[in-house]
């Protein structure tokens, strides 16, 4: 809501509902069974934080990639799932969708970035603009590479460096 979203619907496992309602009482909530219906309702889909890395999470992510062409923001475990061996095929589908015009925004911290690019964390820290650009090019979208400084990279090679902030900005929930 602080970013201007008019209405937010959280699709999550039922056991997460109570704690989430305490933190975000104004949001709507639905179960994983309502994912397809909710994707039709949404203007933008964000996936990743709190999704986990189990098989159920991968199936949920597959549904988001395969059943929708809405703009997609991916963070946290959604990125980790793409980097894992059983997520490679899904990553390829997402790259194809990006090439076909789907809006894709990936928001990795350097650990997630290193896994997605199969590089070391020190390499990604040292070459954050280049790694951000590589990720943006790979998925034909936008990469928001988070570290002590955040770099927003576009597929075309343009990037914006946010010189404010600190390493805490790459911390979960910031």
Where are these regions (language model features)?
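Small-residue (G/A/S/T)-rich helix-start motifs and N-terminal tracts that mark the onset
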Residues: 1-76, 80-105, 110-174
């Amino acid at each position: 809501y602080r970013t201007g979203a008019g209405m937010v619907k959280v699709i999550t496992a039922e056991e997460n509902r109570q704690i989430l309602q305490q933190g975000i009482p104004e949001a709507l909530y639905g179960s994983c069974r309502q994912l397809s219906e909710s994707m039709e309702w949404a203007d933008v889909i964000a996936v990743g934080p709190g999704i986990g890395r189990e098989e159920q999470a991968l199936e949920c992510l597959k549904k988001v990639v395969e059943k929708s062409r809405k703009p997609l923001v991916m963070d946290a475990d959604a990125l980790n799932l793409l980097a894992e061996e059983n997520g490679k095929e899904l990553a390829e589908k997402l790259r194809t969708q990006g090439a076909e015009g789907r809006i894709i925004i990936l928001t990795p911290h350097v650990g997630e970035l290193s896994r997605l690019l199969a590089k070391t964390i020190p390499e990604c820290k040292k070459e954050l603009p280049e790694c951000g650009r590589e990720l943006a090019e790979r998925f034909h979208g936008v990469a928001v590479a988070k570290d002590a400084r955040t770099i927003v990279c576009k597929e075309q090679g343009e990037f914006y460096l946010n010189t404010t902030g600190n390493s805490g900005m790459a911390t979960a929930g910031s």
